[in-house]
A protein has these predicted regions:
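N-terminal helix-loop segment corresponding to the beta1-alpha1 unit
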Residues: 1-189
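Acidic, glycine-rich segments within the central catalytic cores of soluble metabolic enzymes
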Residues: 144, 148-288
Length: 288
């Protein structure tokens, strides 16, 4: 049975995780996705590889696609790209903004070829600002956004990054696919394509959610004092480990955390998630 995106053509200028995951999700929904790779391949092919050109991570984010080897830095590539773009509905790119322009696969250039194109660009920090042309990986954005520190976990004396999965890259991939589907729906109504911008930093801030949202009447003074105090100690060279301990002493866990955590029991570890009063009462009854 054809998927909901059957007939949609996607050209993908991406590598590693966020962009490739978005393309894979669109392919899962029936789109024809053509991944453009340089002659040496997506770097992800070489991570945990089981052959000269394949790896588990690469397969995990690139199933269901067609692959085209093309050195887009050469003049000969421009004709091939133009033919692809003329027939494309969507382009996904995750280069730095300056790199996309240099390679001639930026929105302004491709719009001239196909004005109905939906162009989705994922960068680390966005197109404007002092960090616009800086590269960024999941771990860098974890650190800069505060996501890493918010976990309050240590690896020795340093903050421990979230390593079980590339959280920011993965969530960004879903955001890319989600916004592309929205743009395709808008084009059905208006006939117009558009440019979409997503960023790793924006994704990280979204994931932080209530940790960075502020209700002025409740949070302003308490958070201001905490931030000023911790900032002063950090500038004075207080180790991160000590900062975490100070923060946790001043902000003890709420009563709700006992109902949403893991416990070691006599025979095994268990995880409990009881966020509502009815569930908490049932848990208390079970525990007698």
């Amino acid at each position: 049975m054809p998927g909901p995106l059957n007939g949609i053509k996607v050209v993908e200028f991406t590598e590693i995780i966020a962009g490739p995951l978005a393309g894979m999700l669109l392919a899962d929904m029936g789109a024809e996705v053509i991944k453009i790779e340089p002659p040496w391949g997506d770097p992800w092919r070489l991570i945990q590889s089981f052959s000269q050109t394949e790896s588990r991570p690469f397969l995990a984010y690139n199933r269901g696609k067609k692959s085209l080897t093309l050195d887009i830095t050469t003049p000969q590539a421009s004709d091939i790209i133009e033919k692809l773009i003329l027939e494309a509905d969507v382009v996904i790119a995750n280069y730095r903004p300056d790199v996309a322009v240099k390679l001639g696969v930026d929105y302004t250039t491709l719009y001239k070829i196909n004005p109905a194109l939906i162009y989705c660009e994922n960068t680390a920090f966005g197109r404007k600002g002092p960090d616009a042309n800086r590269p960024g990986y999941d771990i860098i954005i974890q650190a800069m956004s505060g996501l890493m520190a918010s976990e309050g976990k240590l690896s020795g004396e340093s903050p421990e990054h979230i390593s079980s999965s590339p959280m920011i890259d993965t969530t960004s991939g879903f955001c890319l696919a989600w916004t592309i589907c929205g743009a395709l729906f808008a084009r059905e109504r208006t006939g117009k394509g558009q440019m979409i911008e997503t960023t790793l930093m924006g994704t990280a801030l979204m994931l932080l959610g209530s940790r960075i949202s502020q209700v002025e009447s409740m949070d302003f003074f308490s958070r201001r004092d905490t931030v000023e105090s911790l900032s002063a100690m950090r500038q004075a060279g207080v180790p991160f480990k000590d900062l975490i301990e100070i923060y946790q002493e001043e902000h003890p866990p709420t009563s709700g955390t006992m109902y949403y955590r893991a416990y070691q029991t006599k025979d095994n570890a268990i995880a409990i998630g009881c966020l509502s009063d009815p569930l908490r009462k049932r848990l208390l009854n079970i525990l007698n």
